[in-house]
């Protein structure tokens, strides 16, 4: 009996230790294999504009581990972390070591895979006496991201290293404040795409600090809510900065998002307006994290978005996006860039685990009258863990047709020999 008691105590201690060291485990992945009718691997083509189904050539994954490390008298501290990786899936072993080969007469080296630290932060709740319901945070994190899943298009996302307070109860809604760093680490000249190193005094990049304030959860009518936010991009150049960096202007971005809950889904309508460098976000499907500091003084832009998912009877669901964005005076006076996109994804559910998915996308980039047009048609058979539009994991067998009509009559596919192409493959996607 004594031996049994010792074993029981050991088992109990082991279980208790396991509970003490348990962590929250979340993640995302997509991976698969595909080929292109022109030869070679499948490609990714303007997926933010024409849709992502059957249009992703990468392997991408996120592993998120978090743990509540303190909980006492209503006060909690939580440590969160995330690692991400991406590759083209070309080999069994994909790491950071460079693979070198001949590219014509030159040796070209590329990394098989890239790894990144996407999140590492501390979140404290109940520690602010004036707002015990709010969360105080600092570190690197995904910050209240807004995206359209069917095109992988993030339209409001200032994620990065920073600090803030979120979820302060204020009237009918909740207030959040954040300060996030979004440096420009590429070269630019004012009014052009490349040139001088922006700021030698800051490691070659221009320091951009984004100040963000949001008021969310404002009830407007039955099942309808409003979120509004303001982002201020502060360009913080040093004395060693280039003239272009010193001439760069701070910018403001305003966002309003109306969410309407429906009996069988939801719909979101978004309006955004920005000045100076934020004008480029609306012309080029940006999210506010990349600030176009080289934009011409006085540039501005705006964007309208409508997207959502709705059930159509017992067997059909439909996801869609409509985007219209404008950037004005970005490079020269009276210059206008218009970006337009329409994507629909109807899903027919055969049973709880089997679907047929269609996706069609069409987009136009109008550069002062010079139009580039893009299109995509995809059909896929999918097996998923449930019948919902959002059910994952999901394995898909797909075929896609891609087309491009350029203003300069150049060809996009088959190494510049064709204006359309076809590809097929298999992809798995999961989140947990």
From Swiss-Prot:
Induction: By maltose. GO terms for biological process: monoatomic ion transport. Keywords: Cell outer membrane, Ion transport, Membrane, Porin, Signal, Sugar transport, Transmembrane, Transmembrane beta strand, Transport. It catalyses: beta-maltose(in) = beta-maltose(out). The record marks 154 as: Important in sugar transport. The record marks 28, 60, 93, 266, 390, 431 as: Greasy slide, important in sugar transport. Residues 1-22 form the signal peptide. It holds the Pfam family LamB. It is found in: Cell outer membrane. One of its GO terms (molecular function) is maltose transporting porin activity. GO terms for cellular component: cell outer membrane; pore complex. It is a multi-pass membrane protein. InterPro entries: G_neg_Bact_CarbUptk_Porin, Maltoporin, Porin_LamB, Porin_LamB_sf. NCBIfam families: PRK09360.1. Homotrimer formed of three 18-stranded antiparallel beta-barrels, containing three independent channels. Belongs to the porin LamB (TC 1.B.3) family. Involved in the transport of maltose and maltodextrins. This is Maltoporin.
